[in-house]
Amino acid sequence: MLTKLRMYITSDDFEITRHISSVLHGVIMSAIDTDYASILHNSNLNPFSTSLVKNGDEWCWTVATVGQEAYDKIFKVLADKSFSSFVLTSKENAVVNIVKKETFEIPVENLLKATFNDEPSSVLKISFDTPAAFKSRNDYVIVPDLHLVFQILMKKATAATSDDSFFDEETLDALVQNSKIISYNLRTVKFSLEGRRITGFTGYISIYIKGPSLLKNFAKTLFRFGEYLGVGIKASIGMGALSIKEDEK
């Protein structure tokens, strides 16, 4: 099961900014079962992602989950009507109110069927809605390297579906060799995390994909998973949120 919960938040006690995104991760950890929170803390690939984005005058806090356990222990807890406000101790006990919630649910099988039945797209336009970055050879990468993008998306899709066929080096090589960025509009942005700043990038890239239809649809499927799991580092804390904005046949 893939889910998204959009929570529109306000506060009379302080001005909400994107810099509280990592603080909201702590709100989730406090709201869910403590044993499950400990498991997530030690997990390399978390079954959820978060983002905080301003839509017009509204701040939208999105929490997405993959898998039944995350659905039961994260999504259901936060989607419950009793979770209507919370306190940020790091902001002098400021109260944050949730004024509206929107929920979206789709079985993994339905996502796969819908994407693979689509007419193949040669160009995918991908928007990075919150700062994204990667780790490679113990260093940060702050540009959208397609090898790293596809690699992490394949690993996340594998973890989400428990299907090892989503990741193999031959398919990864085929994706990288048959894809290239043909246009982009990117900028570097700082992401606040526990008193320090991580440099990432936001904006969009258009990826041209050649080769067979199966490869094109597989690439689109990976980005569909990315819309729920994010891409790159710290996706559970608010980095790496992405969306497919449009595609061209």
Please provide the spans of the model-predicted regions.
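RNA-interacting cores
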Residues: 1-249
